[in-house]
From Swiss-Prot:
InterPro entries on file: Antimicrobial_frog_1
Compartment(s) where it occurs, according to its Swiss-Prot or TrEMBL record: Secreted; Target cell membrane
Organism: Rana cascadae
Entry keyword DNA-binding: no
Protein name: Brevinin-1CSa
Gene Ontology BP, a term: innate immune response
Length: 24
């Protein structure tokens, strides 16, 4: 897929994981 999407995913996924696990 597009490198831009990969970049966005790299920023979004950690945030979602942080919020989901309450380990910010």
């Amino acid at each position: 897929f597009l490198p831009i999407l990969a970049g966005l995913a790299a920023k979004i996924v950690p945030k979602l994981f942080c919020l989901a696990t309450k380990k910010c």
